[in-house]
Amino acid sequence: MGQQQLLLIILGVIVVGIAVAVGITMFSDSATNANRDAITNDLVNLASRAQQFYRRPTSLGGGGNSFVGITKDAAGLAKLTNKPSNGNAVYSISAAGAGTGTASTVEIEGLGNETGTDGSTPVKVHVKVFASTDSVWVLN
């Protein structure tokens, strides 16, 4: 009888260990997905601000139907937001509307604080902003 009880205790410990491991994995996946969704939401908001800049006349501090002025540095990002990072990610301009003429796109990237699907690098989401639309894709 003592041996049977010992086997039941060992079996119970194994089952609890497996349940804890599965729970941790599910929590980690959920945290990654939540971070990815939050970054996507922030990027769509920044894309909307970039489109507002595009449409705003140059006399009012906008682009005058161009993304020229939204540069890859802090000054370019400051035209879209005064907070280049938040609890979700750090944001940057990955391809700017810099140069002369009419720049037709700008690309913004968010680097999250959770590990992405590859298991080693952070979540990364990218948005390409056009004059009247945007395209979002998840890089990790």
Spell out what each predicted region is:
Residues 4-32:
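C-terminal juxtamembrane segment of a hydrophobic transmembrane alpha-helix
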Residues 1-2, 95:
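Glycine-centered small-residue hotspots that permit tight backbone geometry or close packing
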